[in-house]
Amino acid sequence: MRKALVFLGILALGLAFAQVRTFDQIKKSGEIRIGTEGAFPPFNYFDEKNQLTGFEVDLGNAIAKKLGLKPKWIAQAFDSLLIQLNQGRFDFVIASHGITEERAKAVDFTNPHYCTGGIIVSKKGGPKTKKDLEGKVVGVQIGTTYMEAAQKIPGVKEVRTYQKDPEALQDLLTGRIDAWITDRFVAKEAIKERKLEGTLQLGELVFQEKVAMAVAKGNKSVLDALNKALADLMKDGTYAQISKKWFGEDVRCR
C-alpha cells in the first residue's frame, strides 16, 4: 500500500547496530515481535476500545499462530518502522509497505500479502484523473508512494503533505485541497465509515503496487518461516477468510 521514501543511509546505520534474532532464537523465546503503525485503517489501527485491529493485525496473528508463537505487537510511527526493524526492535514488520527496488536494498521482503494501488479521491464533480489534477492542490501522507506519485503528475499546482491520512481527508472535506491520493482500500473504508458516499467520489488509480512484510536484511531464517506460513494460510483458506472479513473480497496478488 505505502512505500515510504526511506533514506538508505539511515537504514544502513540501523544495520550497523542490528541485533536481530534468527528464527531459532525466536522459537526458543516463544514470542515473535511484530512492528506496525496502528494508524492505517482498515489495515492496522486502534479501535474505539484502543485495541489494535485490522486486516494486517488479523493476518499477523494468524501467521504467529501458524508458527506456534505468541505475537507481541509494537506500534510505531510509520517512517521509523524499517529503521527500528534493522535495529532489532521487531522480528518483522507488517504495515502496508510496498515493495520497491530502493527499499529492497536495505530490508528483505516476503512474498506479497496483498496487492493494491493509489487512487484519486475528490468531492463529487471534482478531479478524477491525473489530467484533471492540473492546476489543483493534492493532499498525501508524508513519506509515502502517494506523495512520490503526486509529485510526478504533470501540472499539479501543489502537493500538500500530512502526517496521517485522516488529516488529508479532513482538508478535502473542508475544501483546503482539491484531491487526496491514498490507498484504494483506505479510501473505500473512509467513505463507508464516515457515510460520505454522497459527498466523495473515487477516481482512477495513479499506480498499482505489491505489498509485503519486511524482515531485517539477510535474516533468511525469519524470511523463509514467514513465507511458508503465509503460503500455508493462503492454501488452507485462512487468508481468504480474513481478507473477505475486511474487504469483502480476496486481495491476494493474482
Regions found by a protein language model. Give the residues of each.
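Periplasmic-binding protein-like
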Residues: 114-121, 184, 188-231, 249-254
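Extended ligand-binding regions for polar small-molecule ligands
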Residues: 58-66, 136-137, 142-145, 210-249
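Bilobed "Venus flytrap"/periplasmic-binding protein-like clamshell domains
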Residues: 33-41, 52-65, 116-167, 184-186, ...
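A ligand-binding cleft/hinge motif common to bilobed small-molecule-binding domains
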Residues: 97-105, 149-152, 173, 178-208
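Acidic, polar ligand-binding/catalytic clefts
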Residues: 61, 65, 70-132, 198, ...
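Short helix-initiation/N-cap motifs at beta->coil->alpha
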Residues: 72-83, 125, 142-145, 160-174, ...
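Ligand-binding clefts/hinges and TM-proximal coupling segments of bilobed small-molecule sensing domains
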Residues: 20-22, 145-162, 198-203, 228-254
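Extracytoplasmic small-molecule ligand-binding "clamshell" domains
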Residues: 20-96, 236
